[in-house]
């Protein structure tokens, strides 16, 4: 911890979905880190351990009928999963929360804001419609904060530029895809850390109902390592790769495509194949990171 200039806060016991870990919480520059012990684990997925409940089976059957798929559920799911393998993961300090990339919080009277009266004119229009936020794509974002507004300026970055800035500014890096799978699933053999399907009692992003108001989002709560990870398929978490590589989400493709909760959240499985992109352009609204 001293080597990375981390300040020890406390020991804490995390427990979730049948796995638990007592470990140290640390702080650096306003960020919370947790010490994740290493382990030798099995990663990847090829078949059900518990099997799906009736609700998940019916949801899949409806989609199979729609796309005229005649194979088994396991065959269908296996196509998008990494192969089963044994991996040894080294211990690491891990940022507890997902963070946005390329957004700089600035005061409303920042000269870079006031130099654009058209932004403020548009903001006034939106404010009049009782809107909570207003964004100009990859340029600026405003969010209501009580009676006032907060502003962020966007600084688009490429994947290599971001990796360099992470190293220089935080002395940190991105987790590898295998490390990410371990942080997310802890070596679980089921499709998700809690079982072989979606628990429909959970409050999920993009599938809320009236009864959920005021409740926390279940998947966003700290897992057995104390991490908030893979809880929103619209968020793609950057991992280490030769070109831009992400885990934990698909930018909302399945949800937006009307595939329903189960397939919508499948990209959040710890076993899902990482998405490798050729362009190296970070999409500020969707791509997020955690330092390790």
Language-model features: where?
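Surface-exposed beta-strand edges and their flanking turn/coil or helix-capping segments
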Residues: 47-51, 56-58, 107-109, 189, ...
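Glycine-rich loops and low-complexity Gly/Arg-rich segments
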Residues: 59-62, 117-122, 198-201, 261-264, ...
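Context-gated lysine
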Residues: 9, 28, 54, 97, ...
